[in-house]
Amino acid sequence: MATTMTKWTLKGKGYEFCNCNPGCTCNFSGFPSSSDGSCKAFVGVAIKEGKCGDVDLSGITCAGVFDWPKAIHEGGGKVVFIVPEKIRDDQLDALAKIFTGQLKGLPWEILGTTYVVAGLVKADMKVTDAGMESSLKVPGVVNAVGETFKNPVTGEPHQAAIALNDGFIWKRGECGVGSFKVDAADLHLSYKNTNWILYDFDWSN
């Protein structure tokens, strides 16, 4: 008899910072626009509604620190996950299975094949949810700050967004300029004035 796979669903808001130029060419050509062709990213995941089997994941804010030497689909990456300090064991187990693609479902059944888990940090993350001026901070671990594009002539806010009808991570992303510094386990990243995208996600298997 075939084993029934545990059903899961996550809905919420994503905060994506990476070392590509603003807009991130990976969304179009599949390859980074970073100076060395690598993909380094910090992605915050604020789960508003979430469930994996009987495990409630609603209200959890977590993150991944990603380090791929080339384009994501070329693999060879590493990730360190950041989870709340007091996360329950059953919640951590559920998220680990989701984010490593063990339970299938996009985007993680694809992303999970491109990296190995290099560490886990248990620390509470402070999210200042202010649209394109949002920030995410864990003292001594991560500081990520987003900014709205500015019109080069007037200096006024310049709103920009990307629509991906077939996007498997997000369908619509609000774009801006971000800076992020991360020291998590063995991953150390620091970038200024690079890509930052804010989006809503609805993932499931």
PLM-predicted stretches and their roles:
Residues 77, 81-158:
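Charged linear interaction tracts used for macromolecular binding and regulation
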Residues 152-205:
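Extended, charged low-complexity segments
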Residues 2-4, 29-32, 66-70, 122-123:
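Intrinsically disordered, low-complexity boundary segments flanking structured domains
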Residues 35-107:
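Aromatic- and glycine-enriched beta-alpha-beta binding-site module
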Residues 3-50:
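N-terminal ordered "arm"
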Residues 53-59, 81, 115-121, 170-177:
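Low-complexity, flexible helical/coil segments
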Residues 1-5, 202-205:
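Intrinsically disordered, low-complexity regulatory segments
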Residues 62-68, 128-131, 184:
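A general structural signal for short secondary-structure boundary/capping elements
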